[in-house]
């Protein structure tokens, strides 16, 4: 462990909370070099929805590598990319009646957010962007400007501008959308008409805050009335995490742009994508690019994930069952320990318990780790204990992890 202490920057964070040298991982489990097993309720912060080393995805990747399939090709056409595009159309976009162009921005979610913001500003000719309290969109400067958390914002080293923040659904009891709509109509409000509104339907890092369907529909109505682009950041809440492939599906909205990353590749490989309506495809060739925007290994595993898990309703039924299992367990904790918890947060398999303060949540997470459960906190003060297991987790493994939480609370 000394090699990390001596040579790696202290900017690392997860390693501080989980100070173990990991060697292997399979499904919902990680194993240390000493052979200790840890159940994963973190899932690579949402990058491992299909679990560690998923056998179906691994086999597809190994076969592709074995036949010397193209690894790196910038944005050139490749067989792997063609198969992914077709799978996305067949299993995701067409069944949902969605018509989007695809831009591969690679390799991370913040790259997708930056590209979406840049394109929105280009096509509207406006610079301002509206985001929401407790939102998180990445740590590069444009995405960071749209992020609310001061811990991350203070790392910028310069002023973050071009963003106006509005209260999220339920924030401090404020009707943020009435405020937003009123300011748009008032020439003296000081609000420059925005190019776009950027939001998460469930705020992952912000504390598992959930926007209601009615609130999302109202946001879309405001955007359409004012010719403002609506961008949904589905980097953490997408790819099935809330129960449907896109987190916004239950609301019936149709964003102008959607950003995806994390579990898009299915295997934890770097991959990011912006979906946008065809009329917004106004880039000039090469106007926005990136060296690693064509990760063919990620295309291979992403394609296989779509074919294996999204060709029918079985996987969504599984997610719904496991989500209900989590909900019932957390509700029991909430009722039994009112001195620790103040509420249930999130939906789908991104749920958690709001603690009365961050110290409680951090202590519970630390004690869970001592008992073999990797779980993190979220929220402005790290006050939410965040259950974020792989979507493929078995009923038995999920019950085991929830039992560890209960044991910690009993102690």
From Swiss-Prot:
Gene3D superfamilies: Aspartate Aminotransferase, domain 1, Type I PLP-dependent aspartate aminotransferase-like (Major domain). It comes from the Bacteria. Keywords: Aminotransferase, Pyridoxal phosphate, Transferase. CDD domains: OAT_like (cd00610). InterPro entries: Aminotrans_3, Aminotrans_3_PPA_site, Dat, Ectoine_EctB, PyrdxlP-dep_Trfase, PyrdxlP-dep_Trfase_major, PyrdxlP-dep_Trfase_small. It comes from Vibrio cholerae serotype O1 (strain ATCC 39315 / El Tor Inaba N16961). PANTHER family: DIAMINOBUTYRATE--2-OXOGLUTARATE AMINOTRANSFERASE (PTHR43552), DIAMINOBUTYRATE--2-OXOGLUTARATE TRANSAMINASE (PTHR43552:SF2). Its EC number is 2.6.1.76. It is an enzyme of class 2 (transferase). This is Diaminobutyrate--2-oxoglutarate transaminase.
């Amino acid at each position: 462990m000394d090699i990390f202490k001596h040579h790696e920057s202290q900017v690392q964070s997860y390693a501080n909370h989980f100070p173990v040298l990991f060697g292997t991982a399979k499904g919902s489990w990680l194993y240390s070099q000493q052979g200790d097993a840890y159940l994963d309720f973190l899932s690579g912060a949402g990058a491992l929805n299909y679990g560690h080393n998923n056998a179906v995805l691994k086999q597809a990747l190994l076969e592709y590598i074995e036949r010397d399939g193209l690894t790196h090709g910038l944005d050139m056409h490749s067989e792997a990319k063609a198969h992914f595009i077709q799978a996305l159309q067949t299993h995701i976009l067409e069944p949902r009646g969605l018509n989007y162009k695809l831009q591969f921005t690679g390799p991370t979610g913040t790259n997708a957010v930056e590209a979406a913001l840049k394109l929105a500003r280009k096509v509207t000719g406006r610079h301002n962007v509206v985001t929401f309290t407790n939102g998180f969109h990445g740590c590069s400067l444009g995405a960071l400007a749209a992020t609310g958390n001061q811990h991350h914002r203070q790392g910028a080293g310069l002023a973050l501008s071009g963003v106006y923040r509005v209260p999220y659904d339920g924030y401090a009891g404020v009707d943020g959308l009435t405020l937003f709509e009123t300011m748009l109509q008032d020439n003296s409000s000081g609000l420059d008409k925005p190019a776009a509104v950027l939001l998460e339907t469930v705020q992952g890092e912000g504390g598992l805050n959930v926007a209601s369907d009615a609130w999302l529909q109202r946001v879309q109505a405001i955007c359409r009335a004012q010719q403002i682009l609506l961008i949904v950041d589905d980097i953490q809440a997408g790819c099935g995490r809330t129960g449907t492939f896109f987190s916004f599906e239950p609301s019936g909205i149709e964003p102008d742009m959607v950003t995806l990353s994390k579990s898009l590749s299915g295997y934890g490989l770097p991959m990011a994508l912006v979906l946008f309506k065809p009329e917004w495809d106004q880039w000039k060739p090469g106007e926005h690019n990136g060296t690693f925007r064509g990760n063919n290994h990620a295309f291979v595993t992403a394609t296989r994930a779509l074919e294996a898990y999204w060709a029918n309703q079985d996987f969504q039924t599984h997610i719904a069952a496991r989500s209900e299992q989590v909900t019932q367990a957390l509700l029991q904790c909430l009722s039994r320990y009112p001195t620790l918890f103040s509420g249930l947060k999130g939906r789908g398999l991104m749920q958690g318990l709001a603690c009365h303060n961050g110290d409680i949540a951090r202590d519970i997470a630390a004690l869970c780790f001592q008992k073999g459960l990797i779980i993190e906190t979220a929220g402005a003060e790290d006050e939410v204990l965040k259950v974020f297991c792989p979507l493929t987790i078995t009923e038995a493994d999920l019950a085991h992890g929830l039992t560890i939480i209960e044991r910690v609370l009993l102690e």
